[in-house]
Amino acid sequence: MRWWDIEPVMGLELELFPEDSWSHGMYWSELAEAHPGGTRHYTVATTGDGTVVGYAGLMAVAGEGDVQTIAVAGRHQGTGLGAALLVDLIREAARRDCTELLLEVRVDNPRAQRLYERYGFQPVGIRRGYYQPANVDALVMRLDHPSTEPKDIEDLHHG
């Protein structure tokens, strides 16, 4: 993700997460750390004409990774794009020597929970009232020892 992606990402952000969307400033702050040696990794998915249809971000510090965000435009959900973005984050976490990768997902989003489970994430806790202002709980999930090896990821996906 580059600075010029922030506007189209914000369009998706507001569409997909109207109650608890990130601000422009939050994305600018995240991108400020997305450089060689930085603590962030962000990626966007685009169509052939350059339209942003998905994005994802990772924070990696001291061997721990955290999925900051992952989103796919509604019309592209169910196409494997979310899985591709997740695999990118898993591989990046492994490249950064993370021994675990954490994420939060809304408890009322079973589709996303199933995606994460297919790639080896396990539930480890609940954060009460995490998503505001709707006061929705977050399920905390963890993947131990993320891998850069495609076969490992494929084994998780098909196993």
Features from the language model and the residues they span:
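Acetyl-CoA-dependent GNAT
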Residues: 3-4, 8-79, 86-96, 144-148, ...
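Short amphipathic helical patch at the helix-1/turn junction of helix-turn-helix
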Residues: 72, 106-107
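Conserved catalytic-core motifs of GNAT/GCN5-like acyltransferases
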Residues: 104, 117, 122-139
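Short glycine/proline-centered loop/turn elements that form peptide/ligand docking sites
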Residues: 86, 108-112, 129-134
